[in-house]
Amino acid sequence: MARRQTHTSKGPSQRQLRAGELVRHALVGIIAREEFRDPDLEGQMISVTEVRPSPDLRVAKVYVAPLGRGDSAKLAAGLNRCAAFLRGRLGREIEMKFTPELHFHADNSFDTASHVDDLLNRPTVRKDLDATRGSEADAED
């Protein structure tokens, strides 16, 4: 009798992490070599930040961000239009039983990190942080 894996919030398995990194590495090479005719992709330098494969490795969420300035949502939409082409190229480069179906998503983690830095550098927040550090130093003495 086959065991069924129950859905837990442990995170991705070692197999998923390894497959995701394999797909990410291959996609970076493919995107760097190929010329795209899509207007949203012309002249864009693309960073593939993360690939999250499904547990059965048949579907992969690919997170992308433009290098420099650019619209992440337009970039993801353009890559989704080219997903079948990219999947075909990916299948020729990697050795997996199934080539995963690619779903591109905008990676906003850089924007979020920049926003948090801006918040922490505001004068009112900096004053509060300095006051907190000063009171901690007094407590240690």
Swiss-Prot record:
Annotated GO biological process: maturation of SSU-rRNA
Q: How does it assemble?
A: Monomer. Binds 30S ribosomal subunits, but not 50S ribosomal subunits or 70S ribosomes.
Q: List the keywords (alphabetical).
A: Cytoplasm, Ribosome biogenesis
Where does this polypeptide localize?
Cytoplasm
GO terms under cellular component: cytosol
> Main role?
One of several proteins that assist in the late maturation steps of the functional core of the 30S ribosomal subunit. Associates with free 30S ribosomal subunits (but not with 30S subunits that are part of 70S ribosomes or polysomes). Required for efficient processing of 16S rRNA. May interact with the 5'-terminal helix region of 16S rRNA.
Specify whether Hydrolase is a keyword of the entry.
no
Q: Which organism is it from?
A: Maricaulis maris (strain MCS10)
Instruction: List, alphabetically, the InterPro entries matched.
Output: KH_dom-like_a/b, RbfA, RbfA_dom_sf, Ribosome-bd_factorA_CS
What does the record give under GO molecular function?
ribosomal small subunit binding
Q: Which Pfam families match?
A: RBFA
Query: What is the recorded name of this protein?
Result: Ribosome-binding factor A
Q: Would you identify the family this protein belongs to, as annotated?
A: Belongs to the RbfA family.
HAMAP family (UniProt xref): RbfA (MF_00003)
